[in-house]
Design a protein with these regions (language model features):
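Glycine-rich phosphate/pyrophosphate-binding loop and the adjoining helix
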Residues: 159-189
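Short, conserved loop/helix-junction motifs that constitute active-site signature segments
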Residues: 97, 123-129, 154-156
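Residues at alpha-helix caps and immediate loop-helix transition turns in enzyme cores, especially N-
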Residues: 114-118, 143-146, 176
Length: 189
């Protein structure tokens, strides 16, 4: 039986006992290609399936660069950010990133790459020795070589290129949850 002398000791114990898994993802609600206006983005739906299955902590990667509400305008901004190699500031940070052994990283494919806020996230933390599993949503491009690309950006991490790739519209179906769970089982995490 554990006995705590102060409430702060209890909180510290509880915080240290958090999940060893972190599901970090970039996803946008609103006007999405091929699915219309949605309250929850396609990649977030996959992230929720993964984190619920693993009982993992979640971190929504959000940059300080607001995107316009219309899909066409969003894509123009995303392309401009990519061509300028722009790094938006993240509006929040992961507390105690070092505690996580395994990171699941999710993102949509925009112009054959993740959104630029994902690069900011990757550059903001030390991934040395961490297991990294990638998942993405797309509307026809597949993962577009991003798994190998991210593996190259994280040479000190153990990045698996056996990622989960799903069309955004399919991420909204009941089958998506089972496919995400089957992927995690196959990874043997």
């Amino acid at each position: 039986m554990l006995i705590f002398n102060t409430f702060n000791q209890y909180l510290k114990y509880k915080y240290i006992k958090m999940s060893k898994y972190l599901v970090a993802y970039f996803s946008l609600a609103g006007d999405n290609y091929n699915v219309g206006v949605v309250k929850v983005g396609n990649t977030q739906l996959l992230a929720e399936h993964i984190s619920n299955y693993l009982k993992a902590d979640q971190f929504h990667i959000v940059g300080d660069n607001n995107y316009p509400p219309k899909y066409g305008d969003r894509i123009k901004q995303a392309n401009k950010e990519k061509s300028q190699n722009f790094r938006p500031k993240l509006i929040s940070q992961v507390n105690n990133f070092a505690q996580y052994e395994t990171i699941f990283l999710g993102y949509p494919i925009w112009y054959s790459r993740p959104p630029m806020a994902v690069y900011t996230f990757l550059e903001s933390y030390d991934f040395s020795g961490k297991n990294v599993y990638l998942f993405c949503t797309h509307e026809g491009s597949g993962q577009a070589g991003t798994f190998s690309h991210i593996k190259g950006l994280l040479p000190k991490a153990k990045v698996s290129t056996d990622g989960l790739v799903m069309q955004g519209a399919h991420a909204r179906t009941p089958a998506a949850k089972q496919e995400a769970e089957n992927w995690i089982k196959r990874l043997n995490c």
